[in-house]
Amino acid sequence: MAALLEAMPDLTVDAESLPTIRQLFAALAAGPEPDGLDATEHTVDEAAGIVLRVLRRSETAASPRPCVYWIHGGGYVIGDRRMDDVRLAAWVRALDCVVASVEYRLSPEHPFPTPLDDCERGLRWVHAHADELGIDIARIGIAGLSAGGGLTAALAQRTKGDTSLPVIFQLLDSPMLDDRQVTPSSRADWLAVWSRDSNRFGWASYLGEHSGAETMPEHAVPARATDLTGLPPTLVLAGGADGFCDEDVEYATRLNRSGIPTELHVYPGAPHGFTMFPGSSLAEQADRDVIDWLRRQFER
């Protein structure tokens, strides 16, 4: 665990550091294309910059493949569609699925609801173009990490009951769900990777004029939703040393109480974003759990 923490960057994100951190993440994401896979780019809205990166096996499938619609993390303020290529490519190889990773506009330049709107538009594009992508429209689920997990939860809330946009699951990896920072884990002073101050900046950037308000627009903050019925089966991953741990466990508990088939995995000692480092034993265990769960969802 100590080696993992040492390898992870200390991200103190604020208005001053944001441009530099964005450049760092862009450089890290600019790696080679995944071996043995087709990686294609599809423009949803050129003016808005909404782009989908689609990963799939090179060989033609005998039947349409299931799909994971992926929303990247970055505190609502950093990141891009390529940053999780290594991890997502492993899912494609293990499950013979298609992964579509969406590029959405970032805050603070584009506060709520723009990022969520972009994610919804990308998902609608995937549904509309499922045939040409070789996707089984009856086996599309949504997933995301950190802020992407928050957007995934919000997207599931927004689209529940929408028969034109069915999703069969939501996978929430260390999701950023609650702007209030009132849980014990969110108040810890030893948080690695994503500090309390960075979290405050991320939420303020995303919520814009609504930041700090007692009430929020619908679907802006997933943890503030009062009705969680009708959501799809859910997997929640939480790191025991993540500031989001308590809010993630609480959200999973609320889903379970609302009758949603919910699986919760808490990884002792894991900091925020640990699944972004596939060489660590914790990340490898988490992805074994994820692949097992995804396989079960696709086979239902």
What residues fall within each predicted segment?
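Gly/Ala-rich beta-loop-alpha elbow adjacent to hydrolase catalytic centers
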Residues: 144, 148, 152
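Catalytic active-site module of serine/aspartate enzymes centered on a nucleophile-bearing elbow/loop
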Residues: 279-300
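Short beta-strand/loop motif that positions the catalytic acidic residue
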Residues: 236-238
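Short amphipathic alpha-helix adjacent to the substrate-entry channel of hydrolases
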Residues: 82-101
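Alpha/beta-hydrolase active-site loop
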Residues: 110-132, 290
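Hydrolase active-site cap/lid region
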Residues: 157-213
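Gly/Ser-rich "nucleophile elbow"/oxyanion-hole loop immediately N-terminal to the catalytic nucleophile
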Residues: 127-142, 162
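A glycine/proline-hinged amphipathic helix-loop "lid/cap" segment
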Residues: 1-57, 298-300
